[in-house]
Amino acid sequence: MPRLKFTLAYVGTAYHGWQTQRRKSLPELPTIQSTLEKVIASIIGKPVRVCGAGRTDAGVHAEGQVAHVDIPESKLKLDWQLVLNASLPKNIRVVHSLYVEDTFHAQHDAVQKLYAYRLWLNHRYTPPVLYPFVWSCGRLDLEAMDKASTFLLGTHNFVSLQNRGTKLLSTVRTISALYREPSQFFSLNESHEVTWFFKADGFLKQMVRNIMGLLVLVGRRKIQPEKIPYILEAKDRRHSAPTAPAHGLTLKKVFYS
């Protein structure tokens, strides 16, 4: 069957992550994957399997999630972006869609992913419009966080920054970019919002949120930047920091060769 590749944006607040979660004798939890599968199945008249590039956690957002699904020949002429956006909840949007070779795989063919984590630095208030999308941290030592981030660049065993729950052959990953950019969303003179960007060939379970939690501890001067290599070398999650909240994280883009 023809394979449809599509790019998704969604607000993850109301969803229990990407992956379908079925529970015995209990209602199915709402997820991005299950919502997409139900809508597409209603259009083509039979069950489908949607595969996503990244299994975002509950509450995590996306601007550039990529997925694929196999479509019957009889539905080839549909404008899938329009059809899906007409049926999906308003907090899930199809940004782009196209047909690809049936060998394409949204998850297995991905070579890098880019995530963004938004921090709000004004300790006095958080704008209500931003509250669902930022972690309100108050003032932070951004220069110390910059220094700490340099120790995380490159290829490392990131098991100290992985939460339990996934069995993997390797916990070695390569971070090619880790940097921050200011945002002047509400002020022309002073920025209260900082976005951290994380680009790597792959991420372990909640790895981005764990790195963000660690960098915030550095920013609060509770950990020295120079301690980062020792945390990595310990290969023990207990030596790291608490996991940052899910709602500050957004999957920005998935890269393919």
Swiss-Prot record:
Acyltransferase recorded as keyword: no
A Pfam family annotated for this UniProt entry: PseudoU_synth_1
An individual GO BP term: tRNA pseudouridine synthesis
Enzyme class: isomerase
Keywords per UniProt: Isomerase, tRNA processing
Top-rank taxon, per record: Bacteria
Entry annotated with the keyword tRNA-binding: no
EC number: 5.4.99.12
SUPFAM superfamilies assigned to the protein according to its UniProt record, in alphabetical order: Pseudouridine synthase
Gene3D superfamilies listed in its UniProt record: Pseudouridine synthase I, catalytic domain, C-terminal subdomain, Pseudouridine synthase I, catalytic domain, N-terminal subdomain
HAMAP family in the record: TruA
Assembly description: Homodimer.
Protein name (Swiss-Prot/TrEMBL): tRNA pseudouridine synthase A
Gene name in the database record: truA
